[in-house]
Amino acid sequence: MGLLLLILASAVLGSFLTLLAQFLLLYRRQPEPRADEAARAGDGFRYLKPVPGLPLREYLYGGGAEELAACSSEAGASSTPTPDSPAPPTLETCYFLNATILFLFRELRDTALARRWVTKKIKVEFEELLQTKTAGRLLEGLSLRDVFLGDTVPFIKTIRLVRPVVASGTGEPDDPDGDALPATCPEELAFEAEVEYNGGFHLAIDVDLVFGKSAYLFVKLSRVVGRLRFVLTRVPFTHWFFSFVEDPLIDFEVRSQFEGRPMPQLTSIIVNQLKKIIKRKHTLPSYKIRFKPFFPYQALQGFEEDEELIHIQQWALTEGRLKVTLLECSRLFIFGSYDRETNVHCTLELSSGVWEEKQRSSIKTVELIKGNLQSVGLTLRLVQSTDGYAGHVIIETVAPNSPAAMADLQRGDRLIAIGGVKITSTLQVLKLIKQAGDRVLVYYQRPAGQSSQDSLGQLEESFLSSSCQAAYEEDAAGLSADTENRDLDSEFEDLASDVRVQTELKEETQPLSHSPKRTPTTLSIKPLGAISPVLNRKLISGIHPPPQKLPSKEGNKPSTLKTSETTEAAQVSKPQGPTFKPPVPPRPQGRVPLPPTDTSAQADPEAPEKPDKVLLPPPPADKPAEKQVKSVDQGEDVAAGKQSSAKQEGVKDLPSESSAPTKDSSDDPQMWESSEVLYRNKVGKWSRTRASCVFDIEACHRYLNIALWCRDPFKLGGLICLGHVSLKLEEVALGCLATSNMEYLTKFRLEPPTPKAMVTRTALRNLSMQKGFNDKFCFGDITIHFKYLKEGEPDHHIVPNVEKEKELHLVEEVSTLPKEEHFVGQMSLSENKHSFQDTQFQNPTWCDYCKKKVWTKAASQCMFCAYVCHKKCQEKCLAETPLCGATERRIDRTLKNLRLEGQDPLLGLPPRVEIEANKSVNKTTGLTRHIINTSSRLLNLRQVSKTRLSEPGTDLVEPSPKHTPNTSDNEGSDTEVCGSNSPSKRGNSAGIKLMRKEGGLDDSVFIAVKEIGRDLYRGLPTEERIQKLEFMLDKLQNEIDQELEHNNSLVREEKETNDTRKKSVLSAALAKSGERLQALTLLMIHYRAGIEDIETLENLSLDQHSKKMNKYADDTEEDLDSEISQLIDSQPFSNISDDLFGPSESV
């Protein structure tokens, strides 16, 4: 009985276990894919990077937690493996590789292709040899008589993987199984192999010597034994190379003849020279960068402008609706480094020509309310063109709280027309304003990125620097005049008649008000693609009704955008909050958008040949016109909130949680701008729902121009181009036609942007010394998906709510900076501890901790948040506020000079105290100071650290405060306000005092250097003098950058070495480097004094202008002509060359 019960229980248990196993196998749920993967799979395509399997990952990354930790720590220090890296215990044999190479060699050795390749390489070496100094003097020519490739190939005995293997920082999660191994493919692979060769490769050369002599040389490679390094890498661009780790053992068989007679005496000389060549070119650290045969796509691409287009019947191959989806960008070169973290965005443009970066500016209109005043507060200057064309008038200064200042006219604005009359001279401006009534309509041009904050807090930006696209551009043409005034003059030929029409309509449509009204103006007469549409927005957005609610950044000043895009006077004259995107000019194009009530919504494509009229913003329409560019951004920031009115600073973007699909705010059907994404770990990824747009391509379109941008962290509203690429639409169309689903996905290498002057490419310095380096490959790549939509096919895929919520959550996690802080352009969101560096400042600087002035201009500055403090305040600052608020600090730094409401002086009566206070802070410094400060922040320029300058037991001699001169450029004491027994004074002032003692320099040296520098080039005209001084300052800045890099490398070597003798050598080298840095600093002060001398003269002239404007404000209108003549006689720029600049005029 018991046996039966046991059998029954076993049967029941077996049945239960069988059913349970079947249930688990058949009904278990599959793991859910990630939100972005599911969305792309639902849309018909998936983009996943190749990843190694677990066995390969164990081989690459070690397979153990301890070894992995060691690899990760070493990977952070250096991306290039060194020969001292730890090796796995076992070595690999490569019999399969040797057999494969031998088989391929046997099949290819005697082919014409292989022999042509070998002879071509040999001839290249001959050409390089003839170009050398020594050989070039003796050799007339080299010719190859015979070459034999040998009967075998190099034999690889053993090979090992060099550790550490650096994983790609793509942000992808690790394996969910819990293995502590990177899931991504390596960024760099390096192998070391023991190689032996005795194949008998030889070649015979005929040599033509000078004086008609000839010689014969036979060289045979008998034996080679050595250790070879083979590297595959993606940094900074994809390439490979091989080189010997150390000097190999090489045996040569050499025979030489001179005029038919043997010359055995030359054998040893030739062998030694061949070994030196191998050591110099093919032994680490020297190598040749190679692309073929693994990466042939890295070759440069050209554009053929005259090629014929492909047509199918009467339609061009490219015509249709093209959906473009941005996937990711990687390896971007940002501010001289590949490891920066910042926000990037992309612009796409359809054009008939390749991408070209040009000056961006906006044409604006303002209504100037003159009232009963006889002066509007403007000082003008006529800038003559160097190419023979008529000059143009620019605004030199704007009096505070004057009618011009209330109308938001700024220094550097170019006046185009007044009251419908084109401006050609300053006298014409004076006459037109005098003849006008209480109100006058002014057309002016302003560079992109220049805002009202620049006029209040950054008056040092002159009109010369505003012609540059960013603070790092070096444009010599901008020093004399606007380089594009020929094109601008042609744009305004028909302006006069159009302005009068606009004035009449404006009076009917706009209510009467005492506030100045501003209306953006769009001019479109240039051919398609004449100007690059970098972040362009149409200034006319009346075609589409604006959103109903736009939250304001300042709660007490709600902003209501009208269709005519006018702003009230309070918003014009008061400093507004910074914009999320800077206003930029419209894209001149052939087809002009018209109001939706018009039957002809688009003009003929050939319209560029006809001058277009100035367009007026139409009244609000019932329905928006159908756009040709549609954004399929679900959950994207509502771009319609980014209206391009002249005063959009008070407007925020709508919340990104909007669930309905929105359309891009740009009215340009050929332009689209993506949302910003965080770029870190050498990669930036777009979400599918935030990076798709649809273009309607027509026959006139030939290229899709793509550009990547980031914000300039040192200039409000500034943008820096990181790279661009122009794609032929025919190639895209052919790629889509290759598959039936009409999709095409590929990666494009970015072309370099316009060269920047002061960006030192530190990350590329070592690599650029190698043969085969091309800096055009160093600007990263972008991966894009294309799809031609069929007729009737929807332009976007409806994502389920669950997947959308997951994706929005994923986007929030990777998200970038708060929207209020985007304009600051900080490099990282995370709060870091202060990282202070000793910095030499050029501008008057105040301590952010004790709020007192840094008299020596040498203080400590945080690398992340630009926090400045005295060296004596550094310890207190770290104790109280160890974390740096990068966002708050930069906002405060940017806005600290803005005046608050109610603090402006009365009209025409600026107090003397305010002028004197602003003179010390907001001195007109021109381009030089801004470039120097920017370069200093980027490269963290600092003096020699205390630890390298001081030795134990050195006595410090404190100078008496009475010997400290009253100057801002000398090396005075930072601690004059403290007592002589102050511990902060004794401890933290040691660096400067010790440098002064060791270098043998005191205050008199700095004073003498500065005083002598004030007389530099004084006999030259002002512009020529500025150019010479700035050239020398740029040259010195580059020298300081290089010396600092050399100094830092010596410090690292000194810390790493344990050899006492080597340490002493490095200490001596550090001392010499410190002396050189000190000498370069003195030279910088020397030449900087010349610039300050020019600024002092200009400030004195501006003071005279202010006095005269106050005087003229009380005079009558009948005396205006005589006052103008007096002002011309006493204008402060009479020493400037008359062929470039005319006299300044005050209005």
Curated annotation (Swiss-Prot):
PROSITE patterns (UniProt xref): PDZ, SMP, ZF_DAG_PE_2
Q: Where is this region: Disordered?
A: 504-673, 948-990, 1126-1147
Phosphoserine is found on 490, 515, 532, 960, 973
UniProt note: phenotype after gene disruption? Null animals show poor overall growth and reduced total brain volume, although the relative volume of certain regions is increased. Mutant mice demonstrate impaired hippocampal-dependent spatial memory, increased spontaneous repetitive stereotypic motor movements and decreased anxiety-like behavior compared to controls.
- Taking the first listed entry, what is the main subcellular location of this protein, grouped into a coarse class? endoplasmic reticulum
Coiled-coil intervals, chain numbering:
1021-1056
Q: Membrane topology type, per the record? A: Single-pass membrane protein
Query: Which stretches are tagged as biased composition: Pro residues?
Result: 580-596
Q: What is the UniProt domain comment for this protein?
A: The SMP-LTD domain is a barrel-like domain that binds phospholipids.
Please explain the role this protein plays, according to its UniProt record: Molecular tethering protein that connects endoplasmic reticulum and mitochondria membranes. PDZD8-dependent endoplasmic reticulum-mitochondria membrane tethering is essential for endoplasmic reticulum-mitochondria Ca(2+) transfer. In neurons, involved in the regulation of dendritic Ca(2+) dynamics by regulating mitochondrial Ca(2+) uptake in neurons.
Identify this protein by name: PDZ domain-containing protein 8
UniProt source species: Mus musculus (Mouse)
